[in-house]
């Protein structure tokens, strides 16, 4: 299973890379806005920093506009993946980009049928938002299971990229189901390594070590 970091913060990306827990990066307009920098500047810096796939999201809502943005972003590097919303115009754009050999990440997926459409259009990745579904009392991880079952039934190449990850349990469940990728905020990446018994055990070992006679 691959871990992507869901961030446009270069400092966070560097920390995740140093941990060996960053196989790729996903960004979106909201994350870029938090940096206070232009999207072009942010994308250039991330491309220079991270060797894995980097999702850059279009803001146009019509297919032609999406294609213009996608072709411009793709020029920044081979690892750039164009992030496109799961709407009809987005599917049109994904189909064209697939034929041109441009990698795509179809985002804002909230149903298995939507994910099926993304795969048929030729998406490289589909991003189901598990946390947002949980927020409205639906089962985000059941959606992941449904999509994976459909993709396996028909041998689709599209990879399931679990998004809107809120806590370590989302990552655990995604891994158990066999999802290809989880894109994770840096705060949750840090939580993955934590367990109260680990902390308590380390504290005891260090306390006992102090009792060992020193020469």
Curated annotation (Swiss-Prot):
It catalyses: D-sedoheptulose 7-phosphate + D-glyceraldehyde 3-phosphate = D-erythrose 4-phosphate + beta-D-fructose 6-phosphate. This is Probable transaldolase. It comes from the Bacteria. CDD domains: Transaldolase_FSA (cd00956). It is found in: Cytoplasm. The active site is at 83 (schiff-base intermediate with substrate). Belongs to the transaldolase family. Type 3B subfamily. It is an enzyme of class 2 (transferase). Transaldolase is important for the balance of metabolites in the pentose-phosphate pathway. NCBIfam families: fsa_talC_mipB. One of its GO terms (cellular component) is cytoplasm. Gene3D superfamilies: Aldolase class I (3.20.20.70). The keyword Nucleotide-binding does not apply. The gene is tal. Keywords: Cytoplasm, Pentose shunt, Schiff base, Transferase. Its EC number is 2.2.1.2. One of its GO terms (biological process) is pentose-phosphate shunt. GO terms for molecular function: aldehyde-lyase activity; transaldolase activity. It holds the Pfam family TAL_FSA. Pathway: Carbohydrate degradation; pentose phosphate pathway; D-glyceraldehyde 3-phosphate and beta-D-fructose 6-phosphate from D-ribose 5-phosphate and D-xylulose 5-phosphate (non-oxidative stage): step 2/3.
